[in-house]
């Protein structure tokens, strides 16, 4: 359950219908085998931990949605694209992605789905590169916390073109139920 008062971004009203991109069946030439799909999705989390987009195969038109809100290429949230956000260290406040569990990989549609935990200790130095100055951030950004996430990736031609995440805040260091 994503609630506006708990999440950094929340537009549950925009989650009523699946985005058409996720239903599209890929041509044979656009597909990746299951193990490659999981490796590509996992590179996203490696990129978060290492603060670089260099190791993540982002499609030039990649977009990410968090709790229904478009969090890339969107001037009202963060104007930068997927790769640019990583290269600009926008996620440097996330220090660990743990309990990674990939539950589904669909070669025909290029989808990977899993559940994960992001750890955010809330230390000022972790926000050095964040687009908003630390003293202007809402408390929810720098309060020590973890996020339980379910994320789905659309991968076409070996590149991540779309990411859909649903998340909820939990106490920092919370254990997973999986």
Residue ranges and their predicted role:
Residues 1-178:
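C-terminal and inter-domain tail/linker signature
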